[in-house]
């Protein structure tokens, strides 16, 4: 038995250099001539570090964004993915602890007219897997990377949702302004047509001029209807983001919008590294790396320490005769 244990320990030390225990290291080296000039490496308050409430100050837009963060189905799904990954990570951490099983049993027997005999037992078994070849360690690191990836994915969905609601809202404001101008133009052309018709009745204009003015007036009327249809379509898109029935959304005007003027763009490399979709892709690669290590570890033996203990009484209901037993096994099975 001692020889087997020593052999397994020596084997684990030998196989430690086979990539099972290696740590994920992202590639960070870049060519020296990648950038044309030097840049200031001081940290700056970039646009990506601003809270969305500081960027979008319109109260109507803020209300729509808050509603979207509560009701959007894609964002809710991303939040559930985070909870799922958190549970998987907790399960991977608990795999390092011993496992216990309790299975109480009881029997009642009677022969002829004798008094009934009661028997009961309370066995307890425990097992503990030794992570010699790093299977559980790599599985935990993989679960940790997937948990971080789910957090980054949730942040990416959140960013896309906020940007989508804001873009749709400002599109509505732009269409509102165009509709106001088109209606003013419609009224102006209506008066022009009436004036031209009066001139024709006075003999100062012909019918061709009136027809030309009317054609332009009807064209402006058609543009008003097109803008109203576009507004309805954009409101339907906004309702889809908010997961609610389409309606007429209360909103401000384009002239009342205010945006912060004092903010730095930031360093492009840092802005790229701060993007949640980029971080999510990096975490996915890290999880695949540790998943590969865990798969390699499955080719080596798994060592499990197991033991059992129990208390039993099978003599009679008035006599206690506890018997305890415990044993230790060291199986070595090769998992393929």
List the model feature ranges, each with a label.
Residues 132-140:
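Short, polar/flexible loop-turn hinges at active-site or ligand-entry regions and domain interfaces
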Residues 18-36, 66-131, 163, 233-249, ...:
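A small-residue-enriched
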Residues 2-16:
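Sec-dependent bacterial lipoprotein signal peptides
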Residues 7, 48, 61, 192, ...:
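N-terminal alpha-helical segment
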Residues 35-44:
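N-terminal targeting signals for Sec/Tat export/insertion, comprising classic cleavable signal peptides
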Residues 14-20, 195:
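Hydrophobic membrane-targeting signal helices
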Residues 43-67:
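Regulatory alphaC helix of protein kinase catalytic domains
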Residues 136, 145, 152-267:
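Periplasmic alpha-helical coiled-coil/stalk elements that build and connect Gram-negative outer-membrane
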């Amino acid at each position: 038995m001692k020889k087997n244990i020593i052999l397994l320990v020596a084997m684990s030390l030998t196989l430690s250099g086979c990539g099972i225990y290696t740590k994920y290291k992202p590639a960070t080296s870049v060519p020296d001539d990648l950038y044309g000039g030097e840049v200031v490496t001081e940290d700056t308050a970039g646009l990506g570090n601003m809270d969305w409430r500081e960027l979008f100050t319109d109260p109507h837009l803020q209300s729509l964004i808050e509603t979207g963060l509560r009701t959007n189905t894609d964002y809710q799904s991303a939040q559930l993915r985070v909870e799922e990954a958190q549970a998987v990570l907790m399960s991977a951490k608990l795999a390092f602890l011993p496992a216990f099983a309790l299975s109480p049993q009881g029997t009642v027997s009677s022969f002829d007219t004798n008094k009934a005999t009661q028997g009961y037992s309370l066995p307890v078994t425990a097992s503990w897997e030794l992570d010699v070849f790093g299977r559980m360690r790599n599985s935990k690191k993989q679960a940790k990377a997937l948990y971080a990836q789910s957090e980054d994915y949730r942040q990416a969905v959140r960013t896309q949702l906020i940007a989508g609601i804001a873009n749709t809202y400002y599109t509505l404001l732009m269409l509102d302004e165009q509709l106001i101008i088109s209606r003013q133009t419609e009224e102006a052309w209506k008066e022009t047509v009436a004036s031209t018709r009066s001139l024709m009745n006075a003999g100062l204009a012909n019918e061709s001029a009136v027809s030309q003015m009317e054609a332009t007036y009807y064209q402006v009327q058609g543009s008003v209807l097109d803008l109203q249809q576009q507004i309805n379509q954009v409101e339907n898109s906004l309702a889809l983001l908010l997961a609610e029935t389409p309606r007429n959304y209360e909103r401000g005007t384009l002239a009342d919008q205010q945006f912060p003027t004092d903010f730095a763009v930031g360093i492009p490399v840092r802005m790229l590294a701060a993007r949640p979709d980029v971080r999510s892709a990096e975490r996915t690669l890290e999880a695949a790396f540790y998943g590969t290590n865990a798969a390699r570890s499955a080719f080596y033996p798994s060592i499990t320490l197991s033991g059992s203990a129990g208390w039993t009484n099978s003599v009679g209901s008035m006599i206690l005769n506890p018997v305890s037993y415990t044993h230790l096994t060291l199986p070595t099975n090769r998992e393929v």
